[in-house]
Amino acid sequence: MDSKESLTPGREENPSSVLAQERGDVMDFYKTLRGGATVKVSASSPSLAVASQSDSKQRRLLVDFPKGSVSNAQQPDLSKAVSLSMGLYMGETETKVMGNDLGFPQQGQISLSSGETDLKLLEESIANLNRSTSVPENPKSSASTAVSAAPTEKEFPKTHSDVSSEQQHLKGQTGTNGGNVKLYTTDQSTFDILQDLEFSSGSPGKETNESPWRSDLLIDENCLLSPLAGEDDSFLLEGNSNEDCKPLILPDTKPKIKDNGDLVLSSPSNVTLPQVKTEKEDFIELCTPGVIKQEKLGTVYCQASFPGANIIGNKMSAISVHGVSTSGGQMYHYDMNTASLSQQQDQKPIFNVIPPIPVGSENWNRCQGSGDDNLTSLGTLNFPGRTVFSNGYSSPSMRPDVSSPPSSSSTATTGPPPKLCLVCSDEASGCHYGVLTCGSCKVFFKRAVEGQHNYLCAGRNDCIIDKIRRKNCPACRYRKCLQAGMNLEARKTKKKIKGIQQATTGVSQETSENPGNKTIVPATLPQLTPTLVSLLEVIEPEVLYAGYDSSVPDSTWRIMTTLNMLGGRQVIAAVKWAKAIPGFRNLHLDDQMTLLQYSWMFLMAFALGWRSYRQSSANLLCFAPDLIINEQRMTLPCMYDQCKHMLYVSSELHRLQVSYEEYLCMKTLLLLSSVPKDGLKSQELFDEIRMTYIKELGKAIVKREGNSSQNWQRFYQLTKLLDSMHEVVENLLNYCFQTFLDKTMSIEFPEMLAEIITNQIPKYSNGNIKKLLFHQK
């Protein structure tokens, strides 16, 4: 028996037997074929040929395959059968095949689906292959058909190593005698693997003028590749039976078997070719054509320490001259002397970590500001005329990589933090109308005041006003302008103050000459902070249109229905207005609803009286710009009595010549004029808010009358008007409840108004309402 075992299939029906040494181990190639279940193959199994040879450094699985006889008939690739017989089929879909970069012949490959093939079918297909293969006595016979462009035997000794894993024999019987199969086509009988290796001019082959494998560079025992001098050497499979080998995954094609057991082969042109996948990693440079599991080591450079290593082209090849690399990091070497490598799984070369380039490290250290001298405290920036403060942004002087100017000019390069607009938080352009704002808010406020726009928020009067959303809600923006203290009078006041300061400067100069004089200062300065009255001006609802068609003859039913529909929309506007009143939303939610249910008629009647007073001098009732009740319409049935009560309000406003500020304060007090007998849930807060607006009414009176002795008298008259509103509203509500309950009148009510009336009727009938009066009757 030779030192290696040979697999010699016969031409009989039964496959050839497998010979093994006594010390030979049976390797488990089907470790992961069935989800981890181990399938041991004995020496008598006809499906595998396994031989073991004891060696001090490695164990080799030696399998002899014929070099192949030349035949004119082109034969497909046999990698399927050999891969299966060697245990390389495991069903992984992530396997990477790399070989075309090194000049391997592109052969078609046939694979079996692991989900559709069982072990019996596998053994039967291998047995068919074994019957059709034969081992020629002279392995050199295949060299007779080499093409003229191939290297000579002297330069490249014929070996059977490089492509043994991808080129195997399939059954090629023709007739009864059968026929020989060839490994390659006519143009692929021999191939030059050195053409794609791109060796430099000083390659071993050119220096020795003989076979490149006989160089001392490759004979060194520390190298990965050993000289392939043995012409009769079978290709070797280096591996450990305990390794978790991930084999080559072939294209998923199910073999077709004839009735007589022959295997039907597909055309090589239709088979998917193996593709090369090169993975690149940052700052990793491989100096050996070995298989390396690459890992990032940070921003450092790695240099391999293999002697005699060459870069194959400019690519980081993950495959050697002989072998297949898988995604798991393992590689199967053929005809390779790996005695210098440790028999460990996922073997990696030892890298020498080279420090980073000094320039990069210096820049990094500078950017990081290492060193106490390069650090600048964020809270120790001093500016002329300012106290020490802490800022949260990085100025140029804080950056160590920027050369700091002399201390005398350092304050010129580092300015204070940018000033922000108090309205939208954009970068402020200056002090406009008494407030530090941007140019956009300045123009907006001027147009809003001069245009007398009555903005109404579509939300809850708490919209976010910033640089991006400042144009979404003009009502909230205008309110925020007033809250910030913007005032058109501030511009005039600023000019006055400037003139006074100039006069003061002139007087101070005279005072310096004559110490007996005293400096003249203004007695009072106008208040620039917003007041509650200014906020009430902002939130005042706009005038609504009734949509009444005056071309159609008037009728009581049509006018009353139109007024109810208009009243429903006015109630909705009143709810939004009440929620925008400062302090009202701080009340309990139930208290807010109760106050609105008790005061909705107060608000509508008082607003109607104000419009009638301002537009018609209390002679007409101006419900809306398109619905004005004149004397002719007042004569309609059931109209005069109600119009008489409403005309009383407008006539009192006209008699007292109520100002707009007084009207706004009185209207707010009417919202707070009726409460339940049991009180509110937040009664103390309610009393505080009500007293606040009573004081605002007094301020409005003082603003109108000045420091006059008539202020208290006017306050008495205005509060008397507020008390009289209870009687007016009571009469209006009685008529409203009557028309609501009397279905024969067929007067329509909007849904929200009908809900309020339904909830309010039992409270009025039970007397569960407490009137808050200023004067005793």
Curated annotation (Swiss-Prot):
Tissue: Widely expressed including bone, stomach, lung, liver, colon, breast, ovary, pancreas and kidney. In the heart, detected in left and right atria, left and right ventricles, aorta, apex, intraventricular septum, and atrioventricular node as well as whole adult and fetal heart.
Domain NR LBD: 524-758
DNA-binding region coordinates: 418-493
Assembly notes: Heteromultimeric cytoplasmic complex with HSP90AA1, HSPA1A/HSPA1B, and FKBP5 or another immunophilin such as PPID, STIP1, or the immunophilin homolog PPP5C. Upon ligand binding FKBP5 dissociates from the complex and FKBP4 takes its place, thereby linking the complex to dynein and mediating transport to the nucleus, where the complex dissociates. Probably forms a complex composed of chaperones HSP90 and HSP70, co-chaperones CDC37, PPP5C, TSC1 and client protein TSC2, CDK4, AKT, RAF1 and NR3C1; this complex does not contain co-chaperones STIP1/HOP and PTGES3/p23. Directly interacts with UNC45A.
Effect of residue 193 to D: Reduces transactivation by the ADA complex
Effect of residue 679 to S: In GCCR; has 50% binding affinity
This protein's name: Glucocorticoid receptor
Residues where Phosphoserine is found: 45, 113, 134, 141, 203, 211, 226, 267, 404
Span list, region Required for high transcriptional activity of isoform Alpha-C3: 98-115
Underlying gene: NR3C1
Other facts noted in the record for this chain: Can up- or down-modulate aggregation and nuclear localization of expanded polyglutamine polypeptides derived from AR and HD through specific regulation of gene expression. Aggregation and nuclear localization of expanded polyglutamine proteins are regulated cellular processes that can be modulated by this receptor, a well-characterized transcriptional regulator.
Resulting phenotype, residue 494 to A: Decrease in acetylation and in repression of its transcriptional activity by CLOCK-BMAL1 heterodimer. Complete loss in acetylation and in repression of its transcriptional activity by CLOCK-BMAL1 heterodimer
Outcome recorded upon mutating residue 423 to A: In GCCR; uncertain significance; reduces transactivation activity; delays nuclear translocation; does not exert a dominant negative effect; impairs DNA binding
Result when mutating residue 477 to S: In GCCR; loss of DNA-binding and of transactivation activity; incomplete dexamethasone-induced translocation to the nucleus; no effect on dexamethasone-binding affinity compared with wild-type
Biological process annotations from GO: adrenal gland development; apoptotic process; astrocyte differentiation; cell division; cellular response to dexamethasone stimulus; cellular response to glucocorticoid stimulus; cellular response to steroid hormone stimulus; cellular response to transforming growth factor beta stimulus
Modified residues (Phosphothreonine): 8
